[in-house]
Amino acid sequence: MEKLYINLDENSYWIYIGKGLLPTLGKHVAGADKILLITDENVEKYYGDQITQIVEGRILEKVILRPGEPTKNLGNVGHLLEIMLEKGLTRSSKVIALGGGVIGDIAGFTASIYMRGIDFIQVPTTLLAQVDSSVGGKTGVNLEQGKNMVGSFYQPKVVVIDIDLLKTLPHRELISGLGEIIKYGIIYDGEFFDYINENLWNLLALEETVVTKIIKRCCEIKAAIVSQDEQEMGVRKILNFGHTIGHGIEALTHYEKYTHGEAVILGMYYEAQIAKNRGYIDESYFRDIEMIIRKTGLDLNISQFILTDLLDAMTKDKKNKGGKISFILPRGKGNVQEVLLTPEELATFLYTYLYV
């Protein structure tokens, strides 16, 4: 088992990474008067009974939500809050978020506002959640106008990453996780980028040593960034590489056509093109990025989107400043910076490279 400490003063916590860690959950809910398990239909059928056995003897309530990004909405937050009140959860209760990024986001946000905050535990079941969304304390839900428009920074009490849970994932969800994994190599660690490229097939085959090393390194990178900037006022912004175009694509497709990781892969590809177009990276490094992205097998053609619609979606991004659209763009291996583009500059790029 590997473990990492996220140092955030009074909000600090441990991340545990390894095989067969789900049964250890019992010790992390010790002292809770009641436990609320929030999960989705797909995860519950594999692990719901196991969780019940693990917390045997304690009062356990379950809420099973539909899988998928549309579940992240204020209506479901209200539903969860009503259940928490109805079941008598107190400030001594604990919430377990068992699922992917969607479950972690909505469970964490609901825990953060119930009675001004009760403890929650992240048990990520997807590769994307294990390498990214379960760490760092970003929680939230979507509005029609955009992704994660309502949310909070609220840290879990512990993150339990059991790599055995990846065995029940469909291949598409492993590809989705690659989006965030590749991102970490590009934004922070050139050597890690090379390691991912060399071991991508072993990762997709769930080779234990490779999976553990990659998950741990992603968590280390995110921990280093979040420890410096918990609430995204500075360096944490680099985690948004691929997410400006990615979020725009998700919004245009109503969060149904692409997984979050797939949208990030598309976003990284086109944002790397912007970086090359502006002279921030050379052709050779762009080809390295393109090669690893193409290994995911994702169709990179997004010319089906109407230019004005894609622009409109990106202008609503909460990261924007002063009427300009915020991008995190590569400047070299393991190095990125924030660049603000006017809608006109972005329209010129998109028209030139996507629509002719």
Curated annotation (Swiss-Prot):
Listed InterPro entries: Dehydroquinate_synthase, DHQ_synth_AroB, DHQ_synth_fam, DHQS/DOIS_N, DHQS_C
Enzyme Commission number(s) from the entry: 4.2.3.4
Molecular functions per Gene Ontology: 3-dehydroquinate synthase activity; metal ion binding; nucleotide binding
Annotated NAD(+) binding sites: G101, V102, I103, G104, D105, T125, T126, K138, K147
Entry annotated with the keyword Cytoplasm: yes
UniProt enzyme class: lyase
Keyword match NAD: yes
Entry's cofactor comment: Binds 1 divalent metal cation per subunit. Can use either Co(2+) or Zn(2+).
Reactions mediated catalytically: 7-phospho-2-dehydro-3-deoxy-D-arabino-heptonate = 3-dehydroquinate + phosphate
Cofactor(s) the protein requires to work: Co(2+); Zn(2+); NAD(+)
Keywords on record: Amino-acid biosynthesis, Aromatic amino acid biosynthesis, Cobalt, Cytoplasm, Lyase, Metal-binding, NAD, Nucleotide-binding, Zinc
Location in the cell: Cytoplasm
Binding site for Zn(2+): E180, H243, H260
A GO term from the CC aspect: cytoplasm
Gene Ontology BP term (one): chorismate biosynthetic process
Coiled coil: none
Homology family: Belongs to the sugar phosphate cyclases superfamily. Dehydroquinate synthase family.
Primary role: Catalyzes the conversion of 3-deoxy-D-arabino-heptulosonate 7-phosphate (DAHP) to dehydroquinate (DHQ).
Protein name: 3-dehydroquinate synthase
